[in-house]
């Protein structure tokens, strides 16, 4: 019974950590505040593309707490008496560390650093979620939406 409950708890905890919305880093996704907003358009050419990782902003709370709780439960099933309490503490600490690292990895997105030479000669760098159309587009024209947050799309 304990093994079934622990397996179910692990499944729930680690499936929740994968719920980070990584589409917000895509060039095709706009925030609610950007909807119905006039944005300037600038044309340019992709000069280079470099693969990068984008780390979503998260505090690691779900992974740390979930991992700590599950590690504590798993540790408490070991031994008896004082040894059981020590195993529970060690399990909780180990689980918290592991849960935090798992959540961190699950909230990373493959991105692309795009160096773009605008038609006016100025060069800018934009980082957004990787798109397969950027991989082979060095020297192709692109559309750049203006403002403090840019979205790059291939024409």
Curated annotation (Swiss-Prot):
Lipidation (S-diacylglycerol cysteine): 19
Statement: the UniProt record of this protein carries the keyword Disulfide bond: no
Superkingdom, taxonomy of origin: Bacteria
Key words, A-Z: Cell outer membrane, Lipoprotein, Membrane, Palmitate, Signal
Listed GO CC annotations: cell outer membrane
Covalent lipidation (N-palmitoyl cysteine), chain numbering: 19
Membrane topology term: Lipid-anchor
Signal sequence interval, chain numbering: 1-18
PANTHER family linked to this entry: OUTER MEMBRANE LIPOPROTEIN SLYB, PTHR35603
Biological source species: Haemophilus influenzae (strain ATCC 51907 / DSM 11121 / KW20 / Rd)
Entry-linked Pfam families: Rick_17kDa_Anti
Subcellular location: Cell outer membrane
Alphabetized PROSITE patterns for the sequence: PROKAR_LIPOPROTEIN
Family: Belongs to the Pcp/SlyB lipoprotein family.
Name of this protein: Outer membrane lipoprotein pcp
């Amino acid at each position: 019974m304990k093994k079934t409950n622990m397996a179910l708890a692990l499944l729930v905890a680690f499936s929740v950590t994968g719920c980070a919305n990584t589409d917000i880093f895509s060039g095709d996704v706009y925030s609610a505040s950007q909807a119905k907003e006039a944005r300037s358009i600038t044309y340019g050419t992709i000069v280079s593309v470099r693969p990068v990782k984008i780390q979503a902003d998260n505090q690691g709370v779900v992974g740390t707490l979930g991992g700590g709780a599950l590690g504590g439960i798993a540790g408490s099933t070991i031994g008896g008496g004082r040894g059981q309490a020590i195993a529970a503490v060690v399990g909780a600490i180990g689980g918290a560390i592991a849960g935090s690292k798992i959540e961190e990895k699950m909230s990373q997105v493959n991105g692309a650093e795009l160096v773009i030479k605008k038609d006016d000669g100025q060069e800018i760098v934009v980082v957004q979620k990787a798109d397969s159309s950027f991989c082979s587009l060095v020297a192709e024209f692109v559309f750049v939406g203006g403002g403090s947050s840019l979205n790059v799309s291939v024409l």
